[in-house]
Swiss-Prot record:
Gene3D superfamilies: 3.30.60.20, Rho GTPase activation protein. Interacts with EPHA4; effector of EPHA4 in axon guidance linking EPHA4 activation to RAC1 regulation. PANTHER family: CHIMERIN FAMILY MEMBER (PTHR46075), N-CHIMAERIN (PTHR46075:SF6). Residues 143-334 form the Rho-GAP domain. InterPro entries: C1-like_sf, DAG/PE-bd, PE/DAG-bd, Rho-type_GAP, Rho_GTPase_activation_prot, RhoGAP_chimaerin, RhoGAP_dom. The modification Phosphothreonine is found at residues 67, 215. In neurons in brain regions that are involved in learning and memory processes. The record marks 179 as: Arginine finger. SMART domains: C1 (SM00109), RhoGAP (SM00324). This is N-chimaerin. The gene is Chn1.
Length: 334
């Protein structure tokens, strides 16, 4: 007979997992699949196999959602599901409405980041609660920023944290920090190390003595983002703020622009600007002022959504100014 303690623990686990009416229906079907008696042996085999497949798929889903519970200190970033049309092998049930997914091909859609399986029509009603599974997120570079931090359950991308820690531990006095380029082949090695080993990647001085390789890897990460750190949607607001002459109005508009960024992007930008502010405190040694860093990071963090090359070219000076303002006013804006 189970103890009172183990029983209360199981009740807590159930409360964590069963968050919706639909999931309650799934649990009922799961219990039926795992424990019901089905009469004759022949009919048992006929009905048992699809139920067993369903039980496995639903149990996997429930376990995944329970184990991916985020640490309370980690912000709960919203992320939309990355649904793609999918052909399922064998019987499958929708994880939203718990109804059978009929058809032989393209029975529904599957989230490429977390593996959620739903009807195409149900996908429009699924909340923005995608919790990417590491088995679906194969790389670090060129991966959507919010997808990466939710998959690894971190506040910021590991690349940003690890590179900045390494740079601040041994490179703040390096002349031309971020302006001087490192050897491109070694920068590519760092990229592959992060894609292969994640947070276990070795970027220490024993592996890469030249700090410019680490700064190059950090800049490459931001350049490779499919959605820039300062997103396409927020881009016009930042450019407009840079054009304002009045300093107070300019900072107020810039603050409003920051609020339009996705939370994971805003947190990463805040952390980066705080780091670049510390870089400017060593300007006598590294010769990198906020203006110089703006020239380097402007085009790296911001990409114009306009296809017109002339319009994008005209924005370069404002991109530089945006980053310069963010660095100088980091303690006020964030």
């Amino acid at each position: 007979m189970p103890s009172k303690e183990s029983w209360s623990g199981r009740k807590t686990n159930r409360a964590t997992v069963h968050k919706s009416k639909q999931e309650g229906r799934q649990q009922d079907l799961l219990i039926a699949a795992l424990g019901m008696k089905l009469g004759s042996q022949k009919s048992s085999v006929t009905i048992w196999q699809p139920l067993k497949l369903f039980a496995y798929s639903q149990l996997t889903s429930l376990v995944r959602r329970a184990t991916l519970k985020e640490n309370e200190q980690i912000p709960k970033y919203e992320k939309v599901h990355n649904f793609k049309v999918h052909t399922f092998r064998g019987p499958h049930w929708c994880e939203y409405c718990a109804n059978f997914m009929w058809g032989l091909i393209a029975q529904g859609v599957k989230c490429a980041d977390c593996g959620l399986n739903v009807h195409k029509q149900c996908s429009k009603m699924v909340p923005n609660d995608c919790k990417p599974d590491l088995k679906h997120v194969k790389k670090v570079y060129s991966c959507d920023l919010t997808t990466l931090v939710k998959a690894h359950i971190t506040k910021r991308p590991m690349v940003v944290d690890m590179c900045i820690r390494e740079i601040e531990s041994r490179g703040l006095n390096s002349e031309g920090l971020y302006r001087v380029s490192g050897f491109s082949d070694l920068i590519e090695d760092v990229k592959m190390a992060f894609d292969r080993d994640g947070e276990k990647a070795d970027i220490s001085v024993n592996m890469y003595e030249d700090i410019n390789i680490i700064t190059g890897a950090l800049k490459l990460y931001f350049r490779d983002l499919p959605i820039p750190l300062i997103t396409y949607d927020a881009y016009p607001k930042f450019i407009e703020s840079a054009k304002i002459v009045d300093p107070d109005e300019q900072l107020e508009t810039l603050h409003e622009a920051l609020r339009s960024l996705p939370p994971a992007h805003c947190e990463t930008l805040r952390y980066l600007m705080a780091h670049l502010k510390r870089v400017t405190l060593h300007e006598k040694e590294n010769l990198m002022s906020a203006e110089n860093l703006g020239i380097v990071f402007g085009p790296t963090l911001m990409r114009s959504p306009e296809l017109d090359p002339m319009a994008a070219l005209n924005d370069i000076r404002y991109q530089r100014l945006v980053v310069e303002l963010l660095i100088k006013n980091e303690d006020i804006l964030f």
